[in-house]
């Protein structure tokens, strides 16, 4: 595949078809992260929790970034168009309708908004247009942020016509508008912005959902978000925590895929308008204050069983969770009963001809890492590891 496809935006700026969810059913989306550039700093090593627990290195200081696993394509920055394209190919195979861009840690005064969200977002928009021109499908976008950031997002994106085709729309009776997800500070969204969007609050671990409130994290049986007397949204998780994933006595692990299976059974039972899967590629977490007993603490991930990403990883799962997701979605969208034999099928060797269980297409496989930053050359946008993307250097 030509590098120019990934690195140069189309001059024709191919528009996408507007996607309106109003009259559709059995829609499936997934939470998606673009914050990975925050972990790449000059002279700061990539920290992998699995390797550290196996005796390979030490935990970093409080607030330092740690990956729970190495992605199958190797470590990558959040603005890497080639990796996004690889993800979108997988989403097309799995029939993912929309992705939810996680900006929940960003506020108007956040100093890293560009690196965390805005730069990856612009890369993603260009990629979607290139894919459209090439005849490839892309999921539409829903942004999820604090309500306090809604005004800035509206001024920057929602109010501009050049972005109107990338959103996922929903009509509540006053015309189809882009869906926007707020944290629980939904009251901080200015009225003039609220009127231009279809707004839902979304947070987790709340068994009693308020009006227009969705959830991204729940134990089975997951609560159902209702709207106009009908089931509107339900979350499906691979694993989840009560407070910290490192608190394994209270967290719910993957259980070799059984947690994912159980949560999907709830979706097949309820069949809401929207199923949201948690998560695709959060991948990393900051070290928190140690527990009173000295236990290192991470909020959203720790050992493989106490993590929740579906993106293919080097070890130990390969692309197993992607295959499970793909086949659950296939049956769900066809209106079939839930398949009960997937765990037995997919614990075996991958059935995907372009994967060898490391999650990398045979066409793009490669391991050379010239600058030793943990990112293989084919995905590396900062080839001298100085913290400045090559595209910005003279």
Please describe what each predicted stretch is.
Residues 14-351, 357:
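Glycan-processing catalytic domains of CAZymes
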Residues 1-10:
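Bacterial N-terminal signal peptides
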């Amino acid at each position: 595949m030509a590098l120019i496809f990934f690195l140069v935006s189309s001059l024709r700026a191919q528009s996408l078809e507007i996607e309106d969810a109003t009259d559709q059913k059995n829609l499936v989306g997934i939470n998606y992260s673009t914050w990975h550039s925050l972990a790449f700093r000059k002279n700061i090593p990539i920290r992998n929790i699995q390797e550290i627990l196996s005796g390979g290195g030490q935990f970093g200081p409080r607030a330092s970034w740690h990956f729970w696993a190495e992605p199958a394509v190797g470590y990558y920055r959040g603005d890497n168009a080639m990796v996004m394209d690889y993800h979108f190919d997988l989403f097309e195979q799995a029939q993912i309708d929309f992705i939810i861009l996680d900006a929940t840690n960003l506020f108007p005064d956040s100093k890293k908004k560009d690196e965390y969200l805005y730069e990856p977002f612009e890369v993603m928009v260009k990629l979607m247009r290139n894919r459209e021109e090439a005849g490839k499908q892309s999921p539409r976008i829903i942004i999820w942020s604090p309500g306090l950031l809604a005004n800035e997002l509206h001024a920057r994106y929602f109010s501009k016509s050049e972005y109107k085709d990338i959103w996922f729309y929903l009509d509540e009776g006053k015309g189809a508008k882009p869906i926007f997800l707020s944290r629980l500070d939904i009251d901080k969204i200015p009225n003039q912005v609220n009127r231009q969007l279809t707004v839902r609050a979304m947070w987790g671990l709340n068994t009693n959902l308020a009006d227009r409130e969705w959830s991204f994290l729940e134990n089975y049986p997951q609560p159902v978000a209702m709207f106009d007397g009908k089931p509107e949204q339900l979350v499906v998780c691979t694993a989840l925590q009560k407070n910290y994933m490192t608190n394994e006595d209270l967290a719910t692990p993957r259980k070799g895929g059984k947690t994912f299976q159980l949560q999907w059974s709830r979706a097949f039972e309820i069949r809401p308008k929207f199923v949201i899967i948690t998560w695709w590629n959060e991948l990393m977490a900051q070290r928190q204050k140690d527990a009173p007993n000295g236990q290192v603490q991470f909020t959203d991930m720790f050992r493989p069983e106490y993590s929740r990403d579906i993106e293919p990883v080097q070890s130990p799962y390969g692309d197993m969770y992607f295959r499970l997701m793909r086949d659950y979605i296939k049956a769900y969208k066809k209106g079939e009963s839930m398949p009960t034999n997937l765990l037995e099928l997919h614990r075996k060797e991958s059935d995907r001809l372009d994967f060898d269980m490391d999650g990398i297409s045979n066409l793009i496989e490669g391991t050379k890492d010239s600058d030793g930053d943990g990112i293989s050359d084919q995905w590396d946008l900062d080839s001298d590891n100085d913290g400045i993307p090559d595209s910005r250097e003279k």
